[in-house]
Amino acid sequence: MTPPAPAARRPSAALLWVLLAAMGAGPLFNYGVSASSTVVMDRLDVTSGQLGTVMTVVFAAAAVTSLGLGRAADRLSARAQLSIIFGGTAAALVLGAVAPSLPVLYAAAAVAGVTQAISNPTTNRIIRTVVPPERRIGWVGVKQSGVQAAQLVGGLFFPAASLALGWTGAALGAAVLIGALWVLALVAAPPLPGAPPPATGPVGGRRRRDTSPLPATVWFFAAIAFLTGLGMQATNTYLPLFAVETLGMTLVAGGAAAAVSGVVGVLSRIGWSRRMSSGDRPTTLLAVICLGAVAGVAVFLAADLLDLPALLWVGAAVHGLTVLGANVVINAGLLSEVPAERLGRATGANSMGMYAGFALGPLLMGLLRDVTGDYRAGFAVVAAGYLLALGVVLLLRRHVGRRGVDA
């Protein structure tokens, strides 16, 4: 069992910043490719649909490795896991920077996916181990906002840097930043030990692996993460291209719209975590998020159908306010449902669902864009995913109601 932190030791603010950076490191690759989309497409001579497959590779790699890395998060030291996150992201950015073809960019994307697969198990385990119970949900909200902080940095830095320095220069610059954060993480984070070995069996001291089933609630959360993740990442990936190709805006403006979504997402994730801390039920918050996300899709479609580019900014803000907060509520729900020694495995299962949605969303959006010539069908699929997620939320509410649990 993962030992609790000594009562006398309180986690430092530096550790919170390390967790935020750990959540944002891997996604910086994703947002860099998305925000530099037209530059990358010209460099590699690919279509927008083909560019979307890069994100599919990222999240397919994350989905495939999530369960195994979730188990690893229950055993490895925190510093070892932080090295996987920051070192792997830096390697992915360097490889992507020099990629001469789409297959090489796929290889970089796979590395980035692995680093992202362990980020939630790592940060959840650290919070459960060293943070007092009354502060955990607040910490989850802050560390989850690291993803949107990466969206903000990527949306502002990559378009301007790629236009000035090319994709190679922009990606290498980001790799230097991640390398510096890696060093700071190892210095600032306290030396957290790895979890003790699994219990041994009666014969020969062999390790006994925990194969007990996870609570059904974990799988409900994983399904919600899959459906909201599908729409979230489809929108994140194609928002800059939607701005350029459909609304006639510049790449810098498209990146700025993604940055707006990221800024609002940072604030919304902290806000949703505060609602959880104040006692709101996860299912109530998730239902509001799903309905709000559908409204955001409607705004994007209105911007297209009415030819009103100004609505892009409204849609980006609604996107950040709603669906970008889903993972905070889901992760906070997991913290309350799963004991510390199994939290890595539970988070890995949830991450598998989320990253499967992340992989499928950009793929569908890109394919539908190439087939139909616009983004309307893709956004319709995104809205359908949010409505299905709402249905799963209602099923979860019914399930926990039968158990007498306030969730």
Q: Language-model segments: which ranges?
A:
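Conserved MFS/SLC helix-loop-helix module at the cytosolic interface between two early adjacent transmembrane helices
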Residues: V64-P100
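Helix-to-loop junctions at the C-terminal end of transmembrane segments
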Residues: T65-S77, S268-R281
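A late C-terminal transmembrane helix in Major Facilitator Superfamily
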Residues: E337-T372
